[in-house]
Amino acid sequence: MSTKEKLIDHVMKEEPIGSRNKVTVVGVGMVGMASAVSILLKDLCDELALVDVMEDKLKGEVMDLQHGGLFLKTHKIVGDKDYSVTANSRVVVVTAGARQQEGESRLNLVQRNVNIFKFIIPNIVKYSPNCILMVVSNPVDILTYVAWKLSGFPRHRVIGSGTNLDSARFRHIMGEKLHLHPSSCHGWIVGEHGDSSVPVWSGVNVAGVSLQTLNPKMGAEGDTENWKAVHKMVVDGAYEVIKLKGYTSWAIGMSVADLVESIVKNLHKVHPVSTLVKGMHGVKDEVFLSVPCVLGNSGLTDVIHMTLKPEEEKQLVKSAETLWGVQKELTL
């Protein structure tokens, strides 16, 4: 008899019940690993699968996470370059792609990443045909559109991480300015995740008090408090971090876990995420942009109708036109 047999008395054969909350992260770069760790620390899955083409890096990351298994509630952490390891995932987070270089615009990355997606997306669909697909790779709005097209999934099951992080950055800076916790500072950044994002100044509030009623020039020229600079700091935030440490990881990882939590726990929370906005706010083309959306079990269930000022709507349409200009040139 083996030690195990002497130690453990078998009462019944275990039923092979699959994972109920399996999450896959594709890409074990800085963003992928920060997302994976954030998901594990929030205890959001009963199985985590990691996939990457770089086998040694993947193997090392999986082992490193497994060695911390004692401190986690997720008992199964697996990884492979073969997508069969991702089978029956509930949520698949795609962070893989060419990394943004210092000074490179997110739009410049596009075709490099489209080619990578042509391999990744069909493999995800093959093994997890019912999953919710969350795209994080940049430029996220265009790549969410690409993932939607390549997957053949209905629109509610393809979500881009969008401006969830931009809005968090905005609320953080707003909190610094007002000496308040970010959760008490309400403000939404919508549109493109990137240079043409739109701050909805008309909705910025603390405890229901509209800041624009207190300061009618807020966000406009001639504002003595220069709130416009807050949005500029949001846009420049990623570039600044990349310049200083070479990449961004922690905040986007936490943002991803925040979105995954709303899905797997069916929270019906509202997040600014990237979805198909054709027909909304005067957008005529098939583009994905961030608007406030409700996330739950089935993915993206509802979109909130924002009351935008004409100027804000104009910026959103301009954003959409920029993205469409790039999208129509893509070879899918």
Swiss-Prot record:
NAD(+) binds at residues 29-57, 99, 138. It comes from the Eukaryota. One of its GO terms (molecular function) is L-lactate dehydrogenase activity. It catalyses: (S)-lactate + NAD(+) = pyruvate + NADH + H(+). The active site is at H193 (proton acceptor). Keywords: Cytoplasm, NAD, Oxidoreductase. It is found in: Cytoplasm. One of its GO terms (cellular component) is cytoplasm. The keyword Glycoprotein does not apply. Its EC number is 1.1.1.27. Pathway: Fermentation; pyruvate fermentation to lactate; (S)-lactate from pyruvate: step 1/1. InterPro entries: L-lactate/malate_DH (IPR001557), L-lactate_DH (IPR011304), L-lactate_DH_AS (IPR018177), Lactate/malate_DH_C (IPR022383), Lactate/malate_DH_N (IPR001236), Lactate_DH/Glyco_Ohase_4_C (IPR015955), NAD(P)-bd_dom_sf (IPR036291). It holds the Pfam family Ldh_1_C. Transmembrane segments: none annotated. GO terms for biological process: lactate metabolic process. Its main location: cytoplasm. Gene3D superfamilies: Lactate dehydrogenase/glycoside hydrolase, family 4, C-terminal (3.90.110.10), NAD(P)-binding Rossmann-like Domain (3.40.50.720). Disulfide bonds: none annotated. It is an enzyme of class 1 (oxidoreductase). Interconverts simultaneously and stereospecifically pyruvate and lactate with concomitant interconversion of NADH and NAD(+). Belongs to the LDH/MDH superfamily. LDH family. HAMAP family: Lactate_dehydrog. Homotetramer. This is L-lactate dehydrogenase A chain. It comes from Sphyraena lucasana (Lucas barracuda). The lineage of its organism: Eukaryota, Metazoa, Chordata, Craniata, Vertebrata. The gene is ldha.
